[in-house]
Swiss-Prot record:
Any coiled-coil regions, as ranges: none
The species this protein was found in: Streptomyces griseus subsp. griseus (strain JCM 4626 / CBS 651.72 / NBRC 13350 / KCC S-0626 / ISP 5235)
Protein name: Thiazole synthase
Active site: K98
Domain of life: Bacteria
Metabolic or biological pathway: Cofactor biosynthesis; thiamine diphosphate biosynthesis
Keyword rRNA processing belongs to the record: no
SUPFAM superfamilies: ThiG-like
Record EC number: 2.8.1.10
Molecular function as annotated in GO: thiazole synthase activity
Recorded GO CC terms: cytoplasm
UniProt cross-references to CDD domains, sorted A to Z: ThiG
Entry function: Catalyzes the rearrangement of 1-deoxy-D-xylulose 5-phosphate (DXP) to produce the thiazole phosphate moiety of thiamine. Sulfur is provided by the thiocarboxylate moiety of the carrier protein ThiS. In vitro, sulfur can be provided by H(2)S.
GO biological process terms on file: thiamine diphosphate biosynthetic process
Amino acid sequence: MSDDVFTLGPAAFGSRLIMGTGGAPSLEVLERSLIASGTELTTVAMRRLDPTVQGSVLSVLERLSIRVLPNTAGCFTAGEAVLTARLAREALGTDWVKLEVVADERTLLPDPIELLDAAEVLVDDGFTVLPYTNDDPVLARKLEDVGCAAIMPLGSPIGSGLGIRNPHNFELIVERAGVPVILDAGAGTASDAAQAMELGCAAVMLASAVTRAQEPELMAGAMRHAVEGGRLAYRAGRIPRRHFAEASSPVAGRAVLDPERPAF
């Protein structure tokens, strides 16, 4: 869909699938999955990354010409997230950051107060901030108001595979947003990615759904097609939901029996 470019901050992408790298069984499987997904933007967790190591995730992304998106996974306070983002900028030479500030290790749900504080500091510091957030339309608006380049609500908890539990909130967020809305967590299979796009999301971000699948490369390809299909369906416009049937065939030309001349 070369006529449907995905614009995110100052950059444009042909693919609307953003991949994560966590949970891959090996670098070889990860590389094949990234190729199958067609992604052009992939996240890496700074706390698990050593840029000096040869044969790392970074070398795979460089070989595939995929843009690196560092994230602040594992941060519980705004201060930790800001420090991690600044270290990433120094180490990787990018001012893009996928901002994650979670409340606890059990749920990995975003801490809205710490998240908003960190977002405001990083935007003021010149970062292109992509925040992982709750599916809360009010918080989404506040994140956009402080200057975030996108809103990335979760469909369900990270790694849960439960899909989008509150599609109505996604519709509200999309309807009010002036920046791209990206599904950021919860996808378990291709239909979840397609649903996100049909709800109006500009892109889908996922990792576990691919890296922990029985066949990661196959699932990556499925996700690619699901995102593309869901986007086409959204652009095409679905038919209205109705309580009763509506015939698709015209009435004109229908055979009508003459009661005085039985057919048999």
